[in-house]
Amino acid sequence: MIRAVYGNIFPLFRLPGERSLPKMSHINVISHRGANIYAPQNTLPAFKKSLEIGVDGFETDIHITKDDKLVLCHNYTIDSTSDGKGSISQMTLDQLKNYDFGSYFSPKFAGTRIPTMEEFLALVETADISVLNIELKSPKKNETAIVSETIRLVKEHGLFEKLIISSFDPKLLVEAKQIDQNCKTGFLYSLNRKTAWSMIRHYVEVAKRLQVDALHPQNIFVNEKYVYEAHEAGLLVNTWTVNLVSDIEKMIRCGVDGIITNYPDVTKGILEKHTY
């Protein structure tokens, strides 16, 4: 009960009686929507803060606008992360750029604008990271466009080798492979999705059917058996959103490949003590 109530407030909360961790090989620390505890999520300041922390990778979310431009935002609307309201798919880029995406978080970030994919990738070009995890949101139209444009822009910026496209929508992952068989993909799933039951029992089979390179499960699905079977099938495991120290340490013990977290600094500190 304590963990359920306070888990997101106290990331350093540790359950009693936890065993120490073995030394492990490298695990990627991937900042979830940037360092979103310190700056507004999915904005350039959040990703710049991630670089200061020294993460191995970025995770972000991409939507397509009414005029077919790619922008970074988690939700389908801008209601909770800006001073505006409305659906991204029903607005042009110029309309979206009129809104403040920083003040809701702190006056310090007043005037922060929604980043375009191009603006984000220009930052990534300067970054010493190895993982560029772009989650594609299912558009109501232009499904092919959001995938093809993402791949085109990433290639244009010379970042294709770092790219892994993830999505809850299998159609987008299949589309990515059809555009370029070398595009790495990861299937996202969580406990509250209709795919949950099949993924509990048949995650390797589903991954093979979708021809993905990685599984991106909510961390509640992950245990040592899960990771072992995924690795035996040649799949990477990047898990999310891992914030509690107890969960971070569990993921280390399980041997995941990447930890997607709101607390990259905390995760990095734990990993530095227990990896080689």
Predicted regions and their residues:
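Phosphate-group recognition and catalysis centered on beta-loop-alpha active-site segments
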Residues: 1-276
